[in-house]
């Protein structure tokens, strides 16, 4: 289950499922929690995946992917894996942490590990959505954000795209 840290004066932490869901809905961010128990144990917490294993992950969650894709018009998906074994991980993370937006939704489903989306709220205040296995998030178009890893520095996620080309980041001049 995701948690949210709001970067206001109080550094408000939202931890209950109801609080998280209500806050994200108010921000226009889609949040779902999929049944991660469907994932075969041999793929849980595995970060060096073969193409066949990535395809298997997509097959395991095919119904959920098809459901959200039909509702939102998504056309393609892939699986990415990041860990300390990933070549140039620090360079990749530095690039991911550049604040940007897209002209379409940025959708991720966390399979293993953890990730953080830092998102600019409607009031201009940033908040971190700390994602765990089973969490799906869809950041709406034109919302400033960035993605990074949590302290464990590893994640396997399904990325779902509006186009077959994937997202095109539009970087901002101002830093977050």
UniProtKB/Swiss-Prot annotation:
Pfam families: ARD. Ni(2+) binds at residues 100, 102, 106, 145. Keywords: Amino-acid biosynthesis, Dioxygenase, Iron, Metal-binding, Methionine biosynthesis, Nickel, Oxidoreductase. Fe(2+) binds at residues 100, 102, 106, 145. It catalyses: 1,2-dihydroxy-5-(methylsulfanyl)pent-1-en-3-one + O2 = 3-(methylsulfanyl)propanoate + CO + formate + 2 H(+); 1,2-dihydroxy-5-(methylsulfanyl)pent-1-en-3-one + O2 = 4-methylsulfanyl-2-oxobutanoate + formate + 2 H(+). Pathway: Amino-acid biosynthesis; L-methionine biosynthesis via salvage pathway; L-methionine from S-methyl-5-thio-alpha-D-ribose 1-phosphate: step 5/6. Its EC number is 1.13.11.54, 1.13.11.53. The record marks 108 as: Important to generate the dianion. Belongs to the acireductone dioxygenase (ARD) family. This is Acireductone dioxygenase. The lineage of its organism: Bacteria, Bacillati, Bacillota, Bacilli, Bacillales.
């Amino acid at each position: 289950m995701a948690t949210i840290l709001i970067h206001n004066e109080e550094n408000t932490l939202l931890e209950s499922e109801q609080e998280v869901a209500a806050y994200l809905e108010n921000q226009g961010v889609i949040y779902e929690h999929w049944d991660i128990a469907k994932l075969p144990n041999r793929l849980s917490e595995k970060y060096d995946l073969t193409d066949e294993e990535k395809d298997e992950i997509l097959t395991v969650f095919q119904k959920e992917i098809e459901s959200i894709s039909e509702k939102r018009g998504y056309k393609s998906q892939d699986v990415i894996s990041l860990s300390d074994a990933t070549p140039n991980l620090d360079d990749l993370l530095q690039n991911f942490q550049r604040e940007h937006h897209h002209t379409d939704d940025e959708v991720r489903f966390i399979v293993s590990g953890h990730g953080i989306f830092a998102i600019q709220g409607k009031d201009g205040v940033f908040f971190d959505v700390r994602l765990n296995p089973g969490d799906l998030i869809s950041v709406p178009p034109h919302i400033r954000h960035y993605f990074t890893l949590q302290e464990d520095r590893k994640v396997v996620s399904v990325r779902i795209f509006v186009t077959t080309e994937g997202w095109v980041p539009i970087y901002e001049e101002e830093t977050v």
